[in-house]
Amino acid sequence: MLKIEGLVLASSSKYRLALLEQIGVVPGEVVSPNIDESLLKGELPRRYCMRMARTKADAVAALRSDKFVLGADTVAYCGKRVLSKTESEDCAVRYLEMLSGRRHRVCTSVCLRSPGGIVHERSVVSVVKFKSMSKGEIEYYISSGQWRGKAGGYGIQGFAGALISWIQGSYSSIAGLPLHETYCLLCGYFDLKHIP
């Protein structure tokens, strides 16, 4: 593991930190950004995702201007409809019923902001297909509480992973941080090549 004191992760997600650690990187600090995550009228899902990742990085960079700041955001969507982070059981049930037996997309955007204000952004869009879920499977998932605060009402890292019949794209991106793209961005500034 390489602890990078000059890197701040702008996130409140323990999963993003764990994903970053998978590529051998430990940020010097983790700061939860306090931002407005409201969707703008007419805003398309990918644009929204990119804006949120950059807004998170910008908000934390305003507090840590001498550091590199890494922000990310994940958005699940069906067509143009953004499936926001779920905070209620009713919302999670609605999302899961809508996603049952269907494909949807998950976009994760990552933004790296340098101390000099240079911004690098990448986005990865993946396709996810849930199996046709029974009422019992949905109820079990809801009772697990794993839906809380998750885009689309699920996290692929938990039991929901057993309900997903296939994905096209990046597993790590669906989980919250596209590792290949993040690694490439960080390699532009930090020597990560010695990490096994």
From Swiss-Prot:
Its cofactor is a divalent metal cation. Coiled coil: none annotated. One of its GO terms (molecular function) is nucleoside triphosphate diphosphatase activity. Pfam families: Maf. It catalyses: a ribonucleoside 5'-triphosphate + H2O = a ribonucleoside 5'-phosphate + diphosphate + H(+); a 2'-deoxyribonucleoside 5'-triphosphate + H2O = a 2'-deoxyribonucleoside 5'-phosphate + diphosphate + H(+). It is found in: Cytoplasm. It comes from the Bacteria. It is an enzyme of class 3 (hydrolase). Its EC number is 3.6.1.9. PANTHER family: BIFUNCTIONAL DTTP/UTP PYROPHOSPHATASE/METHYLTRANSFERASE PROTEIN-RELATED, BIFUNCTIONAL DTTP_UTP PYROPHOSPHATASE_METHYLTRANSFERASE PROTEIN-RELATED. NCBIfam families: maf, PRK14366.1. Belongs to the Maf family. This is Nucleoside triphosphate pyrophosphatase. It comes from Anaplasma marginale (strain Florida). The lineage of its organism: Bacteria, Pseudomonadati, Pseudomonadota, Alphaproteobacteria, Rickettsiales.
